[in-house]
């Protein structure tokens, strides 16, 4: 990391401000070469914005603000310089080119954050939280990413690792001093502690909640043609996303939209009406609808309450059995023919909500239901699929160690415990291969 890196840190396109970031030993030299402070001189004070101009030879390139953050009090723990320029690609590209011609090289994706990790300012789980914070679409995801960035996952894993070290010390004592600690005594003392640690880690592994934070809740609207699925989708989204006509089978392909409820991201998919058809195009739409239902976290079965329950509706109700979802009685603004009492037996305990796509206030119970399905605990510890996978490997090794220990093979149990320790260290990056670092930081943008 002896070289100096530079990159544009803001998104491409026009905007109020564009930022060029430089990190490394030559950062301050580059600042001196291309920035002329107004009413001041170099060296600039650390961590304070200074007004001036980017200058090439005698030409003023841009009017800007510049700041130097001297090591170790910077994002990378190296000398870091940032130029706050007028937004727009041309200016930022020009200033970046000047930085590169002055001795810096173009940063790789995620290299600034990678240097923060390698220099010990953050661990690997916190580095991943930076990406999660950037990618967060909802308040719920933002809060989870911030908890991880401020060390929530790290402190939990390190506490678990400390307990594991203590258990390993007990195993080592039994091996080194067999005349003082028998294998039976070691098993009696350590096996319950291993089991408790395995349970603690298992409780922290909630794959569904982690996926909701990463990707949002997937909701599929299904039902027969002309029950108002597309109208309901449009009403929930507050826009005319799907084409609505009185002609059955208007929706032939999947229509998707994203809704934000109580800080959660909810992806809605309107599907083609589920029915038998000889139309080859419509049949493709029905097949896609069935695949969307299979992939959904929540299924909304939409029924038209202005007409009686049909055999096809009853068939759809049966397909909802064993699935997470609810029954939506639509068109409540029309004279009712079908009521929730008619569906109690067929509902299989699913919630039954009465709405009208044309009456916005009637949608609130449905929105509340969707928000509850998308909610995750504020106490969720592990939110990254990679972390959960590593914790699962640690749990498997702990269970193996417990079983081995109870058969009085203390030395073999020590091997299993070491495997568990390595899995936990992979989460924080204490033990990690270069290939994994490339994979993690390769997901970042260049300027981060």
Question: Which ranges hold each PLM region?
Answer:
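Inter-motif core of Ras-like GTPase G domains
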Residues: 282-306
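Short glycine-/small-residue-rich Rossmann-like dinucleotide-binding loops
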Residues: 237, 272-273, 297, 304-305, ...
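C-terminal-of-GTPase-core extension/linker across diverse P-loop GTPases
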Residues: 2-8, 12, 52, 139-260, ...
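Short beta->alpha junction loops/turns
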Residues: 23-24, 88, 248, 305-306, ...
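Conserved beta-strand segments of alpha/beta enzyme cores
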Residues: 105, 265-267, 351
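A glycine-rich (often HGG/GG-containing) alpha/beta subdomain
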Residues: 1-143, 147, 151, 162, ...
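Switch I (G2) and immediately adjacent beta-strands of P-loop GTPase domains
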Residues: 50-62, 66-70, 249-277, 295-298
């Amino acid at each position: 990391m002896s070289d100096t890196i530079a990159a544009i840190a803001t998104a491409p396109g026009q905007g109020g401000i564009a930022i060029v970031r430089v990190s490394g030993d030559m950062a301050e030299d580059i600042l001196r070469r291309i920035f002329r402070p107004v009413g001041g001189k170099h060296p600039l004070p650390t961590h304070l914005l200074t007004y001036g101009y980017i200058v090439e030879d005698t030409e003023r390139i841009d009017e800007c603000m510049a700041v130097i953050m001297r090591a170790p009090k910077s994002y990378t723990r190296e000398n870091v310089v940032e130029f706050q320029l007028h937004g727009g690609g041309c200016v930022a590209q020009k200033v970046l080119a000047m930085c590169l011609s002055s001795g810096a090289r173009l940063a790789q994706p995620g290299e600034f954050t990678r240097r923060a990790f390698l220099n010990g300012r953050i661990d690997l789980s916190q580095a991943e939280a930076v990406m999660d914070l950037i990618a967060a679409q909802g308040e719920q995801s933002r809060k989870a990413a911030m908890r991880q960035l401020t060390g929530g996952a790290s402190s939990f894993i390190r506490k678990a690792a400390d307990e594991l070290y203590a258990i390993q010390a007990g195993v080592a004592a039994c091996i080194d001093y067999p005349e003082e600690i028998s294998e039976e005594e070691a098993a009696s003392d350590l096996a319950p502690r291993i089991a408790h640690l395995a349970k603690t880690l298992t409780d922290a592994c909630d794959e569904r909640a982690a996926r909701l934070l990463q990707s949002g809740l997937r909701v599929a609207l299904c039902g027969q043609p002309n029950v108002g699925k597309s109208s309901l989708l449009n009403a929930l989204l507050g826009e005319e996303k799907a084409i609505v006509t009185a002609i059955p089978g208007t929706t032939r392909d999947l229509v998707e939209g994203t809704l934000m409820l109580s800080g959660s991201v909810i992806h809605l998919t309107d599907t083609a009406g589920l029915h038998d058809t000889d139309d080859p195009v419509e049949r493709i739409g029905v097949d896609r609808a069935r695949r969307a239902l299979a992939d959904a976290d929540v299924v909304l079965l939409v029924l038209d309450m202005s007409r009686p329950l049909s055999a096809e509706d009853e068939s759809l109700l049966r397909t909802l059995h064993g699935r997470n979802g609810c029954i939506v009685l639509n068109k409540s603004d029309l004279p009712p023919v079908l009521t929730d009492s008619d569906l109690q037996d067929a509902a299989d305990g699913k919630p039954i909500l009465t709405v009208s796509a044309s009456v916005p206030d009637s949608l609130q119970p449905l929105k509340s239901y969707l928000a509850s399905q998308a909610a995750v605990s504020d106490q969720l510890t592990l939110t990254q699929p990679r972390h959960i996978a590593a914790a699962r490997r640690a749990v498997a090794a702990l269970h193996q160690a417990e079983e081995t220990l109870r058969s009085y093979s203390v030395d073999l149990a020590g091997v299993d415990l070491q495997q568990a320790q390595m899995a936990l260290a992979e989460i924080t990056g204490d033990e990690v291969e270069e290939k994994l670092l490339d994979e993690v930081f390769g997901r970042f943008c260049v300027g981060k």
